[in-house]
Structure formats: C-alpha cells, structure tokens
Amino acid sequence: MTSPVTVSERDLRTLLGIVGDHRSDLPPAGLPWSLLAELKDQIPCDALEFFGQDADHQVEWFNQGIPAGSYDDGSDFQFQLYWEIYWDSIACAYPDRTGDVRSITKPLDFYSARQWHSTAMYSEFFRPAGIEHEMMLCLPAGPMRTVRLLFFRGVGPDFSERDRALLMLLRPHLQQGYRDAERRRSSTFPLTPRHWEVLHLVAAGHTNAQIARRLDVTEKTVGKHLENIYARLQVSSRTAAITRAFPDGAAQTAPVLQARAN
C-alpha cells in the first residue's frame, strides 16, 4: 500500500525525539498528552485519536483525543452504532479481519472516493464530524485487540505518502514507547500475590466460577479481588486489567500459581 518516497533525516529525527522523550505527564492509560500533541503538529491534521479496542468484546479500554472529544460524544447510542457497522467497514475492520497490524492505512486504500462516501461508517461518523480523510496506525495488543492511532483531516488534501512513510518508520518506536508507558504504570500500581494469581487466570480465559474453584475460594471473593485489582490499576474491565498488567502479553507464558509456590 506504500510507494517509494523520500523522508528527510530531520523529520525522522524529530519524530524519534518525540517518542523517545521520557515525559512526566503519563496518564492512567495511553501515551503522554504532550507526546500526542507534538505528533499532531509533526503530521499536520485537524484531530488525532489514540485508543485501545477489543473487537471481540466490543469495548475500548482507553481513549485519548486531541482536541479532547473532537469526534466522540461518548454516548451509548454512538458506541452501539459503531459496532453495528464496524465489520462492514473494510477500512476500519481491516486489521482484525486480516491480522495485518503493520500497514499504515487510509480509507482510499480500499475504496474509491465515491464508494467511501456511500459507506455507513462515513455517513454516520465521518461526514457529521466533518472528516474527509483518515490515516491509521495499529499496534498489537492481543487476539482481536489493537491499539490505534488515527489522524483526521477535513476537506482538503489527503494524507501524503510522505506522511505514511513517516508513520511506518515511527511505528516500532511508538510501539516500544507504549510498552514502556505500560511498564511505568504497572510499577506504580502494586498488586498482591493473590491479585497476580487471579489476573493470570483471567488472562487465561477463566470465568469467576472457574477461578474460585481453582483457588478454593468463593465467587464473591474472586469478585472482590477483581474490584481491588481494577481500583489499583485504574481500569474498569477484565480486558483493560489484562492489558495494563501484561503489556507484552507475558500472561500467556507466566506460571499461574507461581506466587503461591514461593
């Protein structure tokens, strides 16, 4: 989906400097706001959105937008409508349908302009918000889970191949920056050995009832552990807790009951 373009060393150094800086404004989820603001300036756009999405469970575990709330009113109706039409949008569902999270994509990679304007996603979300152009970068976050960085523009020129090439070169550094941010957060939210036992079992796909049997406790106790875990990790769902606690997917290989054995 890319064609050869020239990216200046100065542009690349600037972007790498943005991602590589150790920043103090680390939010409860996502990337530092100052980092996102500088990315928006370097790849000119009207708005930028960075969020984590679980397509299997139809949830987001965080969402950052610059300007804040530009294209998302946060309503349950809007969120439900998004998922109703999500899989019909070739451009939006491409990473989940194909497993390709490396490509930097735009809607016009998949549609003609006329076709794009006739889609439900454009009609229900893009057009009402004044969005004509989008460019998307994805990072893997587990099965059917992606972290997405979206750049938006209104009427005018689409994103260029230079813009796409810059994001392609930036992508591995952004991925490392996001992992580093997750590690920094996890170190500030201490969990007990029992909390880690529960989290490993949740990550393995066990229900509360199965976890209760495995740990020889009641389901009510498991629920209480999860409440405490959510509070310490500053999240509100199982998916978000797993993503926060295991930013590199380490839960898939870590021994579930290691804490008890020690």
Label each region the model flagged:
Residues 236-249:
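Short, basic, alpha-helical segments at the C-terminal edge of helix-turn-helix-like DNA-binding modules
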Residues 157, 166-184, 208:
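Signal-transmission/dimerization alpha-helices at domain junctions
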Residues 185-227, 231-232, 247-262:
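Helix-turn-helix DNA-binding segment
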Residues 44, 175, 179-185, 234, ...:
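Two-component transmitter module helix at the DHp-CA junction of histidine kinases
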Residues 4-10, 17-156, 162, 172:
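Regulatory input/activation interfaces that engage signals or partners
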